[in-house]
């Protein structure tokens, strides 16, 4: 994929642009909805191509209902977007893809354009789903999207899947993040979240030159819907505005922590992150 040393040209009257290729989550807590709210909150003009529609089923213990967008419809969305902003759109986030066919469609579209930043949130399953749901997308994501990424934000499960390592400590998380960077060449923000022992939520940033542990006290004892989506979207927005990868990681961590502290409660098993937490 072509890469250039493009310098973002934007202001309050001409904001930076960012595209998310992701799924819709009906309650507004995660997915493309979270991405667009994050972009808007951080002063970036958000654009979306939908890959799937996901909804919780209140009659079935809030399990996920998953409806893939046909690949030809995804392609039509991407054609419209890339035709409308051929010069200015240089930053993209990849979220929930949902199937190998969709992954291949997204990857082909990315290869047809030049990008400064490709942020991969390597979503293999929706929050609350069993790991087995990841099996059919795992290999396609590694083969098609990871090589295109300039930055990736795997959670604990995804870090283990992408690195092939078991992660039980901060040291393990650091080693796994290094491994993912070696495989992909991308900057990595590996998220320990609630899964590592201790009082702090620990993430590890690795870009080949820098290794930095980003740590802050845990808030609550359970995960929050939209935290991973919003973290990757915040990284994307900051990169679109011209931040370095490390600056983007630090600011995204702060953004998500503030949103978790003011999470929106509903009847689903997970509260939803509030993107306005830093106001």
Regions found by a protein language model. Give the residues of each.
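Phosphate-handling active-site elements
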Residues: 43-47, 212, 238-252
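Acidic-glycine-rich active-site phosphate/pyrophosphate-binding loop
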Residues: 6-15, 31, 198-214
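Conserved phosphate/ATP/ADP-binding segment of small-molecule kinases
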Residues: 135-211
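Conserved N-terminal subdomain of the carbohydrate kinase-like
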Residues: 2-20, 32, 36-129
């Amino acid at each position: 994929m072509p890469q250039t040393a493009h310098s973002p040209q934007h202001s309050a009257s001409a904001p930076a642009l960012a595209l998310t290729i992701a799924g819709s989550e009906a309650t507004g807590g995660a997915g493309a909805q979270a991405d667009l709210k994050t972009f808007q909150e951080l002063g970036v003009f958000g654009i979306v191509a939908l890959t799937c529609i996901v909804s919780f089923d209140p009659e079935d213990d809030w399990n996920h209902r998953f409806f893939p967008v046909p690949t030809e419809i995804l392609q039509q969305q991407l054609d419209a977007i890339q035709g409308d902003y051929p010069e200015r759109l240089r930053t993209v986030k990849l979220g929930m893809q949902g199937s190998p066919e969709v992954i291949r469609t997204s990857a082909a579209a990315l290869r047809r354009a030049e990008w400064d930043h490709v942020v991969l949130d390597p979503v293999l399953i929706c929050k609350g789903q069993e790991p087995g749901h990841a099996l059919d997308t795992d290999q396609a994501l590694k083969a098609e999207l990871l090589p295109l990424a300039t930055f990736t934000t795997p959670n604990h499960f995804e870090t283990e899947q992408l690195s092939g390592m078991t992660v039980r400590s901060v040291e393990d998380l650091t080693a796994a993040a290094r491994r993912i960077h070696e495989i992909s060449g991308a900057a990595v923000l590996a998220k320990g979240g609630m899964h590592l022992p201790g009082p702090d939520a620990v993430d590890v940033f690795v870009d080949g030159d820098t290794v930095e542990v980003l740590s802050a006290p845990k808030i609550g004892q359970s995960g929050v819907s939209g935290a991973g989506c919003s973290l990757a979207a915040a990284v994307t927005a900051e990169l679109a505005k011209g931040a370095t990868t490390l600056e983007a990681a630090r600011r995204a961590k702060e953004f998500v922590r503030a949103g978790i502290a003011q999470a929106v409660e509903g009847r689903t098993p997970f509260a939803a992150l509030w993107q306005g937490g830093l106001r």
